[in-house]
Amino acid sequence: MFVRLARIPRITRHYRLGLFSTQPKPKPNEYLYYRNKHKSKMEAPIKRSSSAVSLVELEREPFKVTVIGSGNWGTTIAKVVAENTKANPQVFQERVDMWVFDENIDGTMLTEIINTKHQNVKYLPNIDLPENLVANPDLLKSVEGADILVFNIPHQFLPKIVDQLRGHVEPHVRAISCLKGFEVGKKGVQLLSTYITEELGIECGALSGANLAPEVAKEHWSETTVAYHIPKDYQGDGMDVDHKVLKLLFHRPYFHVSVIDDVAGISIAGALKNVVALGCGFVEGLGWGNNAAAAIQRVGLGEIIKFGQMFFPESRVETYYQESAGVADLITTCSGGRNVRVATHMAKTGKSAEDSEKELLNGQSAQGVITCKEVHEWLSTCEMIEEFPLFEAVYKIVYEDVPMHKLPEMIEELDDIVVAGQ
């Protein structure tokens, strides 16, 4: 039985953590969690079309959240998270630490600029950040006491970050990876969320979707997908992180969140779409038009699904079609973003991927450049390169200087050709 709370103009009265209190009337479109008086577990969220109190009753202290990473996507997610921790103090500690790889910007350290001017002038300029978002250049201090870690760094730096964190993160901590890519090593090809789980001994999910950081930062409406497995050591409703808590942490009126449990599916789609986007950038730079870009996306989607089913059979095909992290993210990434920009620049100038990144990305990287190499290494080990002609074609263009105009013949499916009269 749900308990309906009385609505009084300007002041909403409710019980929070067992104490009767009054709070200002909240903004519309927030989520309300009611605890059924006759059940111990927390009920599912009820979306209100009108103003409502966003209430989750915890039987523990509010969760402390730390974001690891401060690039344009890292800062954008930190902005989203800090807005939600401030709006939901009964669930989250208001302060959000954001670990920053500190840099000198015209004589002032980047962390100081973020904490005084509340803008990341290098990676997310002209976007105001919440004052409860605190930049911290010390990785270990930033995660001290954290209950939820949000990883959002270029994935090639993850092993170094994990090495520094090892032994400093408690087993009860939960994590979400916003990284795109794979870890290829002695254990084969691993999801980055799995790598974090195994190396740090904490449960880690993933966030991915059709999310170009500048658009999310400007609060233009978009969707995303969060995937998280409830771990075996789950402490129960009101005591631990679950799908409801994660939705409350990431959902904003301009950033709609779907929470599922297919971590593998959204991670694979999020990593491999960057490789496909390089292919789209090549044909754009060559001036081949929309038909060619559509062909690249068609082949790319097929190879993404095949890769998932072949190497991560726990992933679900419907995730690629139904979730923002699937085909929607593929379309968005192939329409713009770093990978397309870098590949287009390569096609127009003849410059390498490395030089193009340096010229265009202000110290950041196009993740597809690294991912296509990781995928090539794994497929070579498995002797399955021929099963993924687009992924291999992108690798050869980037790393072996194969001419881009050969792209169609490299991905052509010869077995499907029917020659008249034969």
UniProtKB/Swiss-Prot annotation:
Keyword DNA damage set for record: no
Gene3D superfamilies according to UniProt: N-(1-d-carboxylethyl)-l-norvaline Dehydrogenase, domain 2, NAD(P)-binding Rossmann-like Domain
One Pfam family this sequence matches: NAD_Gly3P_dh_N
Domain of life according to the entry: Eukaryota
Keyword NAD: yes
GO molecular function list: glycerol-3-phosphate dehydrogenase (NAD+) activity; NAD binding; protein homodimerization activity
GO BP annotations listed: carbohydrate metabolic process; glycerol-3-phosphate catabolic process
Catalytic activity line of the entry: sn-glycerol 3-phosphate + NAD(+) = dihydroxyacetone phosphate + NADH + H(+)
Residues noted as binding NAD(+) in the record, renumbered to the chain: G69, S70, G71, N72, W73, G74, F157, K180, A213, R338, Q367
Keywords in alphabetical order: NAD, Oxidoreductase
Binding site for substrate: K180, R338, N339
Top EC class for this record: oxidoreductase
Catalytic-site annotation from UniProt: K273 (proton acceptor)
GO cellular component: cytosol; fungal biofilm matrix; nucleus
EC number: 1.1.1.8
Family membership: Belongs to the NAD-dependent glycerol-3-phosphate dehydrogenase family.
Protein name per the record: Glycerol-3-phosphate dehydrogenase [NAD(+)] 2
